[in-house]
Curated annotation (Swiss-Prot):
It comes from Haemophilus influenzae (strain PittGG). The keyword Transit peptide does not apply. Catalyzes the base-exchange of a guanine (G) residue with the queuine precursor 7-aminomethyl-7-deazaguanine (PreQ1) at position 34 (anticodon wobble position) in tRNAs with GU(N) anticodons (tRNA-Asp, -Asn, -His and -Tyr). Catalysis occurs through a double-displacement mechanism. The nucleophile active site attacks the C1' of nucleotide 34 to detach the guanine base from the RNA, forming a covalent enzyme-RNA intermediate. The proton acceptor active site deprotonates the incoming PreQ1, allowing a nucleophilic attack on the C1' of the ribose to form the product. Homodimer. Within each dimer, one monomer is responsible for RNA recognition and catalysis, while the other monomer binds to the replacement base PreQ1. GO terms for molecular function: metal ion binding; tRNA-guanosine(34) queuine transglycosylase activity. This is Queuine tRNA-ribosyltransferase. The gene is tgt. Its EC number is 2.4.2.29. PANTHER family: QUEUINE TRNA-RIBOSYLTRANSFERASE. Substrate binds at D93, S94, G95, G96, F97, D147, Q191, G218. It is an enzyme of class 2 (transferase).
């Protein structure tokens, strides 16, 4: 993987990730949003439909794909690309976040994490080395190191110990990744909770090890938005400029805009797909809750400015009807729209950076939403 930085507008960055795959060269234009395909599928969508929304890269979930279908079945197909028939780039998380979300079902040690399989109850063990092996079998184009996602709230001492262990796990992840002869990309994950000095130590340690990109982890885990913004404003300028920056598990449309304002290049989140299945649809001027009775006889399209299959062909009344009847097509049409909304948003962001009018775009974006622009505490780097 290569990262090419074309242009900046303030702290916002316009570039691309370039991947050499057996099927050819693939570019992922950045800033980019990655739809989440937890179990090897973006829920309800074929790969062709996901691609039609504008997606150029997907996220797969190492933890869930390890438990089902498992490494052996994955190897029999070739890798995850062959299994799910998505032959463009795939990023896989390390499994760390899912393991740590198990709470009392898991026990963390220096070696790794012992936990109870949520599917069948058996006790299993995941380590940095095992995570690298699973992701190697998945054929991930971007592999994430195994780390501990520091919870919120956490004391300074806990966040420090957690971050230091994640750094030791980062070294082990790097070593096993290299032993496997993996030629794809490996990203480090910056931890440290809401404490700036810990984030700095984490980043410096990761840079010393050396990675192809750097993710900001341990945010969007319940902390106030102000803390997320503060940490991003503090740490992003310190990440090597020639490496991509990935904000994990984020988020709402405004979170993407705020991340880009602070120098982030990559995002992922289940929000557009999960919200779609619950009738919560993103449109140019905010949100449409399609289950609201006022849409029962609304013959207008969901979003007149959207060019997705759903908006070009169906009315709000039809989407309301499908939802009320519990029809699968309703969830699918909603998902197509929400994914397209996110990709259109990213395309608009990229164009605004290219045109050096990103600040104006931010003002217009919030004006359409009827919201004030959140303050940016750091002086823009021009």
């Amino acid at each position: 993987m290569k990262y090419e930085l074309d242009k900046t507008s303030g702290n916002a960055r316009r570039g691309r990730l370039v991947f050499e795959r057996p099927q050819g060269t693939f570019s992922v234009e950045t800033p980019a949003f990655m739809p989440v395909g937890t179990y090897g599928t973006v829920k309800g969508m074929t790969p062709e439909e996901v691609r039609a929304t504008g997606a150029e890269i997907l996220l797969g979930n190492t933890f869930h794909l390890w438990l089902r279908p498992g490494q052996e079945i994955m190897r029999k197909h070739g890798d995850l690309h062959d299994f799910m028939q998505w032959h463009r780039p795939i990023l896989t998380d390390s499994g760390g976040f899912q393991v740590f979300s198990l709470g009392k079902l898991r026990k963390i040690t220096e070696e790794g994490v012992k936990f109870q399989n949520p599917i069948n109850g058996e006790r299993i063990f995941l380590s940095p080395e095992k995570s690298m092996e699973i992701q190697y079998d998945l054929g991930s184009d971007i592999v994430m190191i195994f780390d501990e996602c520091t919870p919120y709230p956490a004391t300074f001492d806990y966040a420090k110990k957690s971050m230091e262990m994640s750094l030791r796990w980062a070294k082990r992840s790097r070593a096993r990744f290299d032993e496997l002869g993996n030629k794809n990309a490996l990203f480090g994950i910056i931890q440290g909770g809401v404490f700036e000095e810990l984030r700095k130590v984490s980043l410096e340690g990761l840079v010393n090890i050396g990675f192809d990109g750097y993710a900001v982890g341990g945010l969007a885990v319940g902390e106030p938005k102000e803390d997320m913004h503060r940490i991003l404003e503090y740490i992003c300028p310190q990440i090597p400029a020639d490496k991509p920056r990935y904000l994990m598990g984020v988020g709402k449309p405004e979170d993407l805009v705020e991340g880009v304002r602070r120098g982030i290049d990559m995002f992922d989140c289940v929000m557009p797909t999960r919200n779609a299945r619950n009738g919560h649809l993103f449109v140019t001027d905010g949100i449409v809750k399609i289950r609201n009775a006022k849409y029962r006889d609304d013959t207008s399209p969901l979003d007149p400015e959207c060019d997705c299959y759903t908006c070009k062909n169906y009315t709000k009344a039809y989407l309301y009807h499908l939802d009320k009847c519990g029809e699968i097509l309703g969830a699918r049409l909603n998902t197509i729209h929400n994914l397209r909304y996110y990709q259109r948003l990213m395309a608009e962001i990229r164009q605004a950076i290219e045109d050096d009018r990103f600040d104006d775009f931010v003002v217009e974006f919030y004006a359409r939403m009827g919201k004030p622009v959140p303050p940016l505490q750091l002086a823009d780097k021009s």
